[in-house]
């Protein structure tokens, strides 16, 4: 089967095309039925395209994502990103004769997105229906106006092309994309598992009994980890998004510290002055707003030299990693899981990956670690397609699909 997937939960417009060959039973029998999984055999995923249009430069001037600005950009980007994605997948076929569309249903779908209606109408008039079996789309959680843009685009395509829709949970997609390149497909070796989802909008610990069976056991009570990176960076005068900026400067600080035998001699060094909020609480929840405030107090009245900023960045990053690592390992032990699964934009952080790897290699408690490729940690259409491939029995009629900004796994 071929899945066309759409992602617009925040500020990235992502569209991917994924070919998935049926999973056959371990004994070489008939394909596994929809909704069933044979982890002894790996499904054959073939990426036909994965196109992402980023809005980072647009939102840099605001120091963060403005939902209505992001929505406007999605309306501009969806049609051209779809065309590019289908072209890369070799599924784009121009019509020999352009047929003008006069369809009230399509216009009704886009009644709140007139610009997207204009672009979509032109697209449908100009190109043939692609040879895809399903349209998958993120319907939550995320920024509501952004979600609706992607959902309505998918609804219009589904209606006009008569292709069924598979709604996808954005958080579940961050989890399931790990299985695309996973070598071990024995369910007994993978589950139960624990997923740490860390991004600008979410910080959650999710217990996974099996695919489709999730329980959130901990989450942030205020700022998400990625949000803390961004806000700390803003205090330090760094550009949005703050995560990559802090990571780069933290690496410089670490290198400088290694070259300095006595850190006390380094007046700009910040020796564990920043707190690790809730690190030793008896639950699995997080809180990062206090860390952001601590950065504000630490830097107040200080001369923000390059070395000092780099050292604060190192401490901010390490404080966040310390909390994430401690909580995750403790929850993994308490719930007796076999695998830790990382996901979300912050999981692309090299130091976070490094310290998780080291911790799991040195702990007495044996755990598998699944981490997505860095380019699949951030939002993209491919992860939506992968998630949809596990839930093709959950297709819905286009009329019944709606966005849910507060959707839970």
Language-model features and meaning:
Residues 159, 168-193, 387:
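Conserved phosphate-binding catalytic cores of ATP/NTP-utilizing and phosphoryl-transfer enzymes
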Residues 139-140, 157, 199, 340-349:
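Glycine-rich beta-strand-to-loop/alpha-helix junction loops that act as flexible
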Residues 77, 96-126, 248-254, 269-340, ...:
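A contiguous, well-structured pocket-lining segment that forms one wall/lid of small-molecule binding clefts
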Residues 2-9, 16-19, 46-50, 189-191, ...:
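A short helix-loop
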Residues 1, 20-43, 90-104, 125-128, ...:
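Intrinsic disorder/low-complexity segments
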Residues 167-168, 340, 356-357, 365-384:
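Conserved phosphate-binding/catalytic loops in two-lobed NTP-binding clefts
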């Amino acid at each position: 089967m071929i899945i066309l997937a759409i992602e617009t939960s925040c500020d990235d417009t992502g569209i991917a095309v994924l070919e998935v060959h049926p999973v056959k039973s371990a004994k070489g029998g008939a394909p596994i039925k929809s909704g069933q999984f044979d982890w002894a055999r790996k499904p054959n995923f073939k990426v036909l395209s994965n196109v992402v249009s980023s809005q980072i430069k647009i939102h840099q001037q605001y120091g963060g994502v403005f939902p209505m600005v992001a929505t406007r950009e999605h309306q501009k980007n969806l049609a051209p990103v779809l065309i590019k994605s289908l072209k890369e997948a070799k599924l784009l076929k121009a019509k020999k004769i352009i047929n003008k569309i006069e369809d009230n249903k399509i216009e009704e779908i886009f009644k709140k997105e007139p610009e997207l209606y204009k672009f979509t109408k032109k697209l449908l008039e100009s190109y043939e229906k692609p040879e895809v079996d399903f349209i998958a789309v993120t319907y939550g959680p995320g920024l509501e106006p952004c979600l609706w843009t992607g959902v309505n685009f998918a609804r219009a395509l589904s209606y006009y092309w008569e292709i069924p829709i598979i709604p996808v949970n954005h958080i579940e997609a961050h989890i399931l994309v790990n299985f695309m390149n996973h070598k071990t497909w024995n369910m007994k070796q993978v589950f139960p598992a624990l997923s740490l989802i860390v991004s600008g909008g979410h910080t959650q610990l999710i217990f996974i009994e099996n695919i489709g069976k999730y329980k959130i056991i901990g989450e942030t009570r205020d700022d998400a980890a990625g949000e803390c990176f961004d806000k700390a960076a803003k205090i330090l005068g760094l550009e949005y998004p703050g995560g990559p900026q802090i990571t780069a400067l933290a690496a410089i600080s670490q290198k400088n510290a290694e070259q300095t035998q006595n850190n006390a001699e380094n007046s700009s060094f910040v020796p564990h002055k920043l707190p690790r909020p809730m690190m030793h609480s008896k639950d699995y929840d997080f809180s990062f707003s206090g860390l952001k405030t601590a950065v504000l107090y630490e830097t107040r009245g200080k001369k923000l030299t390059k070395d000092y900023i780099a050292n604060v960045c190192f401490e901010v990053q390490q404080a966040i990693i310390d909390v994430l690592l401690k909580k995750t390992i403790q929850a993994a032990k308490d719930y007796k899981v076999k695998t830790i699964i990382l996901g979300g934009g912050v999981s692309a952080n090299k130091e976070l990956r490094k310290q998780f790897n080291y911790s799991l290699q040195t702990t007495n408690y044996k755990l598998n670690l699944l981490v997505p490729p860095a380019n699949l940690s951030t939002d993209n259409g491919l992860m939506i397609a992968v998630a949809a491939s596990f839930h093709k029995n959950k297709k819905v009629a286009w009329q019944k699909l709606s966005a849910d900004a507060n959707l839970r796994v």
